[in-house]
Amino acid sequence: MSFFKGQETYSIDNKGRVNVPAKMRKSISPDANDTFIVTRGTDKCIVAYPMNEWKTYEAKFAALNQYDEKDRFFLRMILAWSDEVEVDGQQRVTLPKKHLEYAGIEGKVTIVGMIDHIEFWNPEEFDKYLGGHTESYEEVAAQVMGK
């Protein structure tokens, strides 16, 4: 299993290519074959799952009821936005234009490790997200981890 953590801000070129941080590359399982599935995040970001991690989600997707309106909507959205990308010889991934436009990413990108996947954010949006909570980190940590 992958375990991505940390945060880096990198440049992204006009072709959508960005380096995968070295510390995150080390967490990619050999089972992923240097392949990610990128899709739209639930916040205004792009998420990238190593192929082996994505396979576990595919099993969950297959178990959803395609006759249920919410299940069907979710499946259409996540699968329509899903693209396969590979880590190239220079340790970069190319993020599709539609994803970059959705997340408002150009020039710089903040890359965040999120256990089984990596998130790509517009740096300003990420800062807004972090600052947009009414509760402090300590309060949220006590609620989440104190269960």
State each model region's role.
Residues 1-9, 14-17, 23-85, 89-90, ...:
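Flexible "stalk/tail and boundary" regions
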